[in-house]
Amino acid sequence: MTVLFWDIDGTLLTTAKGGMFAWDDAVKEITGRDFQLQTLRIPGMTDYQIAAKTCELLGLERSEELAHRLVRRYEELLPSSLPRRTGHVLPNVREVLEALRDRTDVVSYLRTGNTRGGATAKLTHYGLIDFFPTGAFAEDTKERATIAVRALALAREAGPVAEDHAFVIGDTPHDIECANAIGVRTIAVATGGYSVEELRAHHPWRVFEALPPVDEFLRLVGLPPASARASARQAHSA
């Protein structure tokens, strides 16, 4: 069985910074302070890392309770904030997910720094929610490596996971670190906040400008392309 662990922002989709409205409004409501999330380089940061950094920059006492309130209000505001910018699903993503959907030799999990609520809002808005029945989220941790360990444990509940048949797909050095932490391969894509050169410096297994087209992606992760499977079925029926 091939196992794929997918990041969201910059890998599956871009909100075109639509989520920043929700964060800035949440900070204003809860702290009374003005804040612009665009002042941070957030690719690769978890929602709770963003909360902690926000408090630090505003000179507020960092507390789990305040971080929790910020994140929960952000989740509530996110569905109405996303339409304020024209985000989109990134190249080849929908086609690849469609090609994987009905296969029995591969399973996809989310492995994301979003909380479950944030991930659900984004995937629902961009029409990708049905491709991901489950995953590991940043519910109570700031560390991506912890999320990766949880994602791997989730996959192992369904059966053995071979290192050479398991892949993290992501767009930041943090995703590469996560893959290394759990001993699987990284497919890095430069569709987020980092260039191919920046990603390559962290030694991913493979790096691309964007997610490869369907057949190339399937071959990359060791799966026969749909065309080959169709030919095999025709030969068998003949």
Language-model segments: what does each one mean?
Residues V168-R206:
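Acidic, Mg2+-coordinating phosphoryl-transfer loop and its flanking beta/alpha structural elements
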Residues M1-P43, Q49, C55-L57:
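Active-site neighborhood of HAD-like aspartate-dependent phosphohydrolases
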Residues E56-A99:
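Metal-dependent phosphoesterase signature
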Residues V93-T124, A136-K142:
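Substrate-recognition element of Asp-dependent hydrolases with the DxDx(T/V) motif
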Residues Y48-R62, A151-L154:
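Helix-loop "lid/cap" segments that line or gate small-molecule binding pockets
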Residues Q38-T39, P43, A67-H68, I129-K142:
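A short, structured active-site edge motif that brings together acidic residues
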Residues A145, V149-E177:
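Conserved Lys-Pro-Asp/Glu-containing loop-to-beta segment of HAD-superfamily phosphomonoesterases
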Residues M1-W6, R62, R219, P224-A238:
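Non-catalytic pre-domain segments flanking phosphatase-related domains
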